[in-house]
Design a protein with these regions (language model features):
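Acidic/histidine-rich alpha-helical segments that form the ligand environment
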Residues: 77-117
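Alpha-helical bundle segments that constitute or directly flank the non-heme di-iron/ferroxidase center
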Residues: 1-27, 50-60
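Hydrophobic packing residues in well-ordered alpha-helices of helical domains and bundles
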Residues: 4-11, 90-97, 123-126, 130
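Residues at secondary-structure transition points
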Residues: 2, 35-39, 88
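Short, contiguous alpha-helical
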Residues: 12, 31-76, 109-148
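Short acidic/polar alpha-helix capping motifs at helix-coil junctions
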Residues: 6-8, 21-23, 46, 68-70, ...
Length: 148
């Protein structure tokens, strides 16, 4: 099992790639639909933030020994996250993403022993999740910048 330092380094590398692409866009580009048909880059950032916040919540439970595994309806959660965040202003979405990431990292750091569930939540909500979305984000950023 990787150490916390290795897990956080993996997350930091993925975040740097993702955030670099996001920051290469102007505010109007971040809000233009097309990342997915109805999603903008802002919606993607909100989506990632929601899952990082969920991971932070779970990691807190792991830290205090109150974590109970439960089945998730990921599609329903994604829909709820989208509906809750879609109309938020871009600066709020970006601030929430940075806050959620910081909390996720802090909660991971607070855990005495990284158990498999903690590793899974951290990886799935952080670096693996970034990797899942990076290919399409790279394409969409190229398309947006090519219009300029």
């Amino acid at each position: 099992m990787p150490t916390k330092r290795q897990l956080c380094k993996h997350e930091d590398d993925g975040w740097a790639d993702l955030n670099g692409l996001v920051e290469s866009l102007g505010p109007e580009q971040m809000e233009e639909p097309g990342y997915y048909p109805d999603w903008s880059v802002k919606d993607l950032v909100a989506h990632l933030a929601a899952w990082m916040a969920e991971a932070a919540r779970i990691l807190t439970q792991v830290h205090y020994g109150t974590y109970l595994k439960r089945d998730l309806d990921v599609d329903a959660m994604n829909k709820d996250f989208y509906e809750a965040n879609h109309d938020l202003p871009l600066p709020v979405v970006r601030a929430e993403a940075f806050a959620a990431r910081n909390r996720m990292l802090a909660e991971m750091n607070a855990i005495d022993e990284v158990i498999p569930e903690a590793e899974d939540w951290f990886e799935e909500s952080g670096p693996r999740h970034y990797q899942e979305h990076l290919p399409r984000l790279r394409e969409w950023v190229q398309e947006l910048q090519g219009r300029g």
